[in-house]
Amino acid sequence: MKNVFNSKGKLVAGDSPLQVYPSTPPPAILKCRDIFSNCLLLRLLAILLVIIGTGTSKLYAQNAIVTENAKPGNPSSEWQISGAGDLSIQGFATDISYNKGETARFKIKTSARAYTINIYRLGYYQGNGARLQGTATVTATLPQSQPNCLTNSSTGLLDCGNWAVSAQWAIPSTAVSGLYIAKLTRTDTGGSSHIVFIVRDDASTSDLFFQTSDATWQAYNIYGDNNNGRSLYTGSGGKAVKVSYNRPFLTRNGGGGGGPQEDWLFNAEYPMIRWIEANGYDVTYTTNVDSDRRGNLIRNHRVFLSVGHDEYWSGAHRAYVTAARNAGVNLAFFSGNEVYWKTRWENSIDGSGTSYRTLVCYKEGSTGENTCNGKCDPTSNWTGLWRS
């Protein structure tokens, strides 16, 4: 059945969802370079070129995204915050993503004697942009004292993984994959902030596989618990060559070397999420981290979407995406400055040795910003420009 779009680019209800080429004709690689301005028409044309095919369409009502977005959303006045939020209550998830049915755990630093944690999923939801999914349980005795984050002066790494767990949320086994935010709100002052994490569906064979640019979120993140934070660009004592996922995000405030208009999810990922879900696409979500540690799952989908400021890719990340393309998966780059710096991953330094918690990029060579003008990564791996 032919799909019909209204004047706002929205798929008219009742039509079948867009279809995807299974493996022939050859996979397409599409790019929307101007991700930081309004290129909706180009995005739409690219999606149509990649996705419209001759395969058997799924029934519109069977699409989990359509069903989820039909539920009443919550207005942005309820879930949104200004910038990175209140610095007196900040936290992070113990992983950037969790499979549905797992438990998300949060480490939070605050002097508050009481606070709430509401969990929202980002989407369209009648234009509200998010829907309340539940509340997390505070497991720590409050007020909770957290130690100073661990640091390494030679690399600039700051790792707050030594903080104790403060709260948790049991992700329902029926949860819909997506970008989720835990909104932390102090009971006394009303100060609030966000913890961002992704809910995966590792068994999914959805048409679209949406990858966030979380490595870039961290590359520009300058969080430090004692005015000692560093990003891969700047910070107290100079730039870092290693940054940790065991930190709250201050990226939305800027100051980490780029700008909040370019380097955070509400710039590019969030508008794309709203558009995709408003139009009923069959989509599940993944991360830069997961494109490396479970990149084999990319082949289970018809289209791989790079969305946002997708600047930092590891070697395994690129190898998995290339292998998926060669196997017939279409690639669509709704991103800018993508696949620019080559990275590698290390374990955390918090004593747990948790994998995929440290992003490493020495910016080797002499081309690009903040380079070390040579081979400076102590390993044999190159962590400089991909194009050098």
Can you annotate each of these PLM segments?
Residues 339-388:
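An acidic, glycine-rich "communication" segment
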Residues 145-161, 167-176, 261-347:
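Helical hinge/lid and interdomain linker segments adjacent to catalytic or ligand-binding clefts
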Residues 66-88:
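Proline/serine/threonine-rich low-complexity linkers at boundaries of modular beta-sandwich domains
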Residues 90-114, 119-125, 130-134, 138-188, ...:
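Ligand-binding face of N-terminal immunoglobulin V-set domains in extracellular IgSF glycoproteins
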Residues 1-40:
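N-terminal secretory signal peptides that target proteins for export/translocation
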Residues 61, 113-115, 119-123, 132-137, ...:
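Aromatic-Pro/Gly-enriched surface loop or interdomain linker
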Residues 43-54:
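Bacterial N-terminal signal peptides
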